[in-house]
Design a protein with these regions (language model features):
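Structured soluble/peripheral alpha/beta segments that form catalytic or ligand/cofactor-binding pockets
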Residues: 154-163, 167-172, 177, 218-254
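Amphipathic repeat-derived elements
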Residues: 133-141, 250-252, 256, 266
């Protein structure tokens, strides 16, 4: 588990140094898993390191400085730390379900945003930074000296975030899209050979630098026009009045602007639907169910309702329900969730609710979730939510069907 996660403040190098010094052991455990996963996919470590160094230009100097800080703090070589950051999404892609009720479709007239974070497990996840063959999820608070404050969820020891909220009232999430191209033999190999971008790192950049959803999307778009995402997938940004969804594959990009309407994404493209796999039943079921739930209470969507939707077991409980369950650690199942309620008048008072563990368990126990606004400080966060213990207690594949 992670012992000192994770409030980071100051310069990017200092933020990285803090992470490296606090999580050196955990980062090493994740690196072991990272290289083992890539090995099983047929990658050669030296070739990947070489490509990682060549891809350094994908990151701005602030990000490079943060990675250097992590490397120094954890006493890990910079090339390996850089490569881990660049290609993390290739080894451990985000699955996930995202829903948003934008503007007037929210009960307060402002946006409500939800993401369930789903991931596969691996028999390489066996260190203290893991539990039941899954990465431990923790709450992170980032306060860079020249950017917005961000609260979100991350895997222990990983700098990129799964989903988060900024003090400008911008919410964000990501998910992979299962495409015909991705299923073809050798496509994953291409993700290393080309300069490719990590969605989770991109949304963090958008949250730190963007003052609204469109601006956050504009911040990440120049890079996407030059280089594809590491795997096909979506990025979702939302503020009080507007949502922006970016779909990207290796050669295609599409964007949807959402105003006073509902939207959702599972692991299937909507705009680039000709690329989607027809046999991905889970993504189809979850996407349809998200729209059913949102349409039924359009204009009355609240944080409490989104939390309820996060626990939804229709089409399951199992891999086809929004709260996803499995019978083997290798299946894609829900590990954490976040619901964000934007305050358009006072963005710093926007609220985020985070559940660590299986949503149907964690949302029902105060020990496993937190609801706060953007003024949260280190003393406001329960130790179990910072060190991963709450996640370990409330991660299970057994469905919780009690009221």
């Amino acid at each position: 588990m992670a012992h000192k996660l994770l409030f980071c403040k100051g310069s990017y190098y200092d933020m990285g140094l803090n992470q490296g010094e606090s999580l050196g052991y955990e980062i090493r455990q994740n690196l072991i898993a990272f290289w083992e996963v890539l090995k099983t996919l047929g990658y050669d470590k030296n070739e990947v390191l070489e490509q990682g160094i060549k891809s350094e230009s994908l990151y701005e100097q602030s990000r490079v400085g943060e990675i250097a800080g992590i490397a120094d703090g954890a006493r890990i070589g910079y090339p390996e730390m850089l490569t881990y950051n660049i290609f993390h999404d290739v080894a451990f892609p985000e699955e996930c379900t995202v829903m948003m009720a934008v503007g007037s479709t929210g009960a307060t007239g402002d946006t409500v945003f939800m993401k369930n974070s789903d991931k596969v497990g691996s028999d390489t996840y066996t260190g203290e930074n893991t539990y039941k063959n899954k990465e431990v999820n923790v709450v992170v608070v980032l306060e860079p000296e020249d950017g917005n404050k961000v609260i979100g969820v991350a895997a222990a020891g990983v700098t990129a975030i799964k989903m988060g909220l900024s003090d400008r009232g911008v919410a964000a999430g990501t998910n992979i899209s299962r495409t015909v191209e991705l299923a073809k033999r050798g496509v994953e190999k291409d993700s290393i050979k080309i300069k490719a971008l990590d969605r989770a790192a991109l949304i963090r950049d958008g949250l730190i630098k963007g003052n609204n959803a469109l601006e956050a999307a504009q911040i990440v778009m120049p890079g996407l026009l030059e280089n594809p995402m590491s795997t096909p997938g979506n990025m979702e940004f939302a503020d009080a009045r507007e949502g922006v969804i970016i779909e990207g594959s290796y050669k295609e990009l599409a964007m949807e602007i959402v105003r006073d309407d509902i939207a959702a994404r599972s692991n299937r493209f909507v705009l680039l639907k000709e690329l989607a796999r027809d046999d991905d039943l889970s993504s189809i079921c979850r996407y349809i169910r998200c729209h059913q739930l949102l349409e039924e209470i359009k204009g009355e969507v609240t944080m409490d309702k989104m939390i309820e939707f996060s626990m939804d077991h229709v089409n399951g409980p199992g891999p086809n329900s929004i709260c996803r369950h499995g019978t083997h650690f290798s299946e894609e199942t829900s590990l954490s969730a976040a619901v964000m309620e934007i305050n358009g008048r006072e963005p710093e008072k926007s609220r985020i609710a985070i559940a660590l563990g299986k949503p149907c368990h964690a949302w029902k126990d105060k020990e496993a979730h937190i609801i706060c606004d953007m003024t949260i400080g280190p003393k406001d966060l329960a130790e179990g939510l910072r060190n991963g213990e709450a996640w370990k207690k409330f991660y299970t594949e057994e469905p919780n069907i009690r009221d």
